[in-house]
């Protein structure tokens, strides 16, 4: 039986009276690639951001590597991680690749990837440098580009640096929030190829995506979110080959044109 890496149970998120997530659950075992698809506004990115507490969920529980995250209410009634050290640990185990790269503009490519291993993991500069060089090479960023600042890179290169930065933490699960949606069409393929390579190597990944080809051919499991709820989920061949929900049928018909 595969080792469970991430278990999200009955997650809710409310903004005042407006409920964005209405009880979403997800289980990722080692090597799983879970794609979350759905229309804009369905709650996909909010769900991902709640998993590592970039957004505070309103209800629910999260288990990472068998460890239940201890949650308490903040003054606004939302859930937060009770212990700052546990939050820090959580974010080393679940690392995020963002839609808009979120690289530090005042740091070189190499410094961007070294920063968190030094500040969060406590690696020496030499150890962090070796790790950064290794993962930058893995995503196809050569030594010449490593000394550049993000502004001098293409969008595809910046996103590959962002993936290297996430990998440098050597996390349990990689979270991808629409990693290709800010890219020019001709740059999408280079990022998807890296993600496919990571999947083939057995990395555990949760991916919010509009790339139906990736969801269909690389995922082990697909979740279709609609208005904050799971409308349908299952193996990709089931969801794409024989969708049961009329909403999913309509969504796929529009997406696969």
UniProtKB/Swiss-Prot annotation:
Q: How does it sit in the membrane?
A: Peripheral membrane protein
Superkingdom of the source species:
Bacteria
Mainly localized where? membrane
Listed under GO biological process in this entry are: amino acid import across plasma membrane; L-histidine import across plasma membrane; L-histidine transmembrane transport
Entry GO terms, CC: ATP-binding cassette (ABC) transporter complex, substrate-binding subunit-containing; membrane
Q: What does this protein do?
A: Part of the ABC transporter complex HisPMQJ involved in histidine transport. Is also part of the ABC transporter complex HisPMQ-ArgT involved in lysine/arginine/ornithine transport. Shows ATPase activity. Responsible for energy coupling to the transport system.
The family line of this record is:
Belongs to the ABC transporter superfamily.
Q: What is this protein called?
A: Histidine/lysine/arginine/ornithine transport ATP-binding protein HisP
Q: What is the source species? A: Escherichia coli (strain K12)
Q: What is the lineage of its organism?
A: Bacteria, Pseudomonadati, Pseudomonadota, Gammaproteobacteria, Enterobacterales
């Amino acid at each position: 039986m595969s080792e469970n890496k991430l278990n999200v149970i009955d997650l809710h998120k409310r903004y005042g009276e407006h409920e964005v997530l209405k009880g979403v659950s997800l289980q990722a075992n080692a090597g799983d690639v879970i794609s979350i698809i759905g229309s804009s506004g369905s709650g996909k990115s909010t769900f991902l951001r709640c998993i590592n507490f970039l957004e505070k969920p309103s209800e629910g529980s999260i288990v990472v590597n068998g460890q239940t995250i201890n949650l308490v209410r903040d003054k606004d009634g939302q859930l937060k991680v009770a212990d700052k050290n546990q939050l820090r640990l959580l974010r080393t185990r679940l690392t995020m690749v963002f839609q808009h790269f979120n690289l530090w503009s005042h740091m070189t490519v190499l410094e961007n990837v070294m920063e968190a291993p030094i500040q969060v993991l406590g690696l020496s500069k030499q150890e962090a440098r070796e790790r950064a060089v290794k993962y930058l090479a893995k995503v196809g960023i050569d030594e010449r580009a490593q000394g550049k600042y993000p502004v001098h890179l293409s969008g595809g290169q910046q996103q590959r640096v962002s993936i290297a930065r996430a990998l440098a933490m050597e996390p349990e699960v990689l979270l991808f929030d629409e990693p290709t949606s800010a890219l020019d069409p001709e740059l999408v393929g280079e990022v998807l190829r890296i993600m496919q390579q990571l999947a083939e190597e057995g990395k555990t990944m949760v991916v919010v995506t509009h790339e139906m080809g990736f969801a269909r051919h690389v995922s082990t499991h697909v979740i279709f979110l609609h208005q904050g709820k799971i409308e349908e989920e299952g193996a990709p061949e089931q969801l794409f080959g024989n969708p049961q929900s009329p909403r999913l049928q309509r969504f796929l018909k529009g997406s696969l044109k």
